[in-house]
């Protein structure tokens, strides 16, 4: 298994993996090929895939705004879970973010995503009960939660 930086040419395989992963929150704009191209252009060194025999089996989308890091859309293929791949992807993203001067990283997980929440707790991410996450769409977004 190899961890490498994600490229736009990985998009179709990565998107298929996201669709096959329960608990993902996708939408038609941000997660389109154009949306991911924009994200990778802004964050060229912080997004990674895990590959085995030329097949993408894991992905982590992470980036920052110069002050805080954020992790989006982390997934490992069902048959490859519980083998340390997710942790290796997180380590790669965290190391890259740290190298870019980022000192704190946040993420959002659906409350009902028990598997995802257990994974992130194991990775050392704490729940912030004193915060309420809010969002507002400023474009016509179609949600596609898995």
What residue spans do the PLM features occupy?
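Conserved beta-strand-loop-alpha-helix junction that forms the acyl-donor binding cleft
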Residues: 107-116, 135-138
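A short helix-loop-beta-strand connector motif used in the catalytic cores of GNAT acetyltransferases and
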Residues: 37-49, 70
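A short beta-loop-alpha structural element at the N-terminal edge
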Residues: 2-16
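Terminal substrate-recognition subdomain of acyl/acetyltransferases
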Residues: 122-123, 132-146
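A conserved beta-turn-beta hairpin within the catalytic core of GNAT-like acetyltransferases
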Residues: 63-72, 81, 127-131
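Conserved acetyl-CoA-binding loop-helix of GNAT-fold acetyltransferases
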Residues: 76, 82-95, 122
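Conserved GNAT acetyl-CoA-binding A-motif
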Residues: 97-109
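Conserved beta-strand in the GNAT
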Residues: 49, 55-63, 70-75
């Amino acid at each position: 298994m190899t961890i490498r930086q994600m490229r736009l040419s990985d998009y179709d395989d990565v998107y298929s993996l996201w669709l096959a992963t329960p608990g993902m929150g996708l939408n038609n704009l941000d997660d389109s090929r154009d949306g991911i191209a924009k994200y990778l252009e802004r964050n060229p060194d912080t997004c990674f895939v895990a590959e085995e025999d030329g097949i993408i089996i894991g992905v982590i989308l992470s980036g920052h705004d110069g002050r805080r890091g954020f992790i989006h859309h982390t997934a490992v293929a069902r048959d490859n879970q519980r083998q340390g791949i997710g942790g290796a992807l997180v380590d790669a993203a965290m190391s890259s973010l740290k190298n870019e001067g980022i000192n704190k990283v946040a993420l959002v997980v659906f409350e009902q995503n028990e598997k995802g929440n257990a994974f992130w707790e194991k990775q050392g991410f704490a729940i912030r009960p004193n915060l309420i996450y809010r969002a507002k769409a400023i474009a016509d977004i179609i949600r596609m939660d898995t």
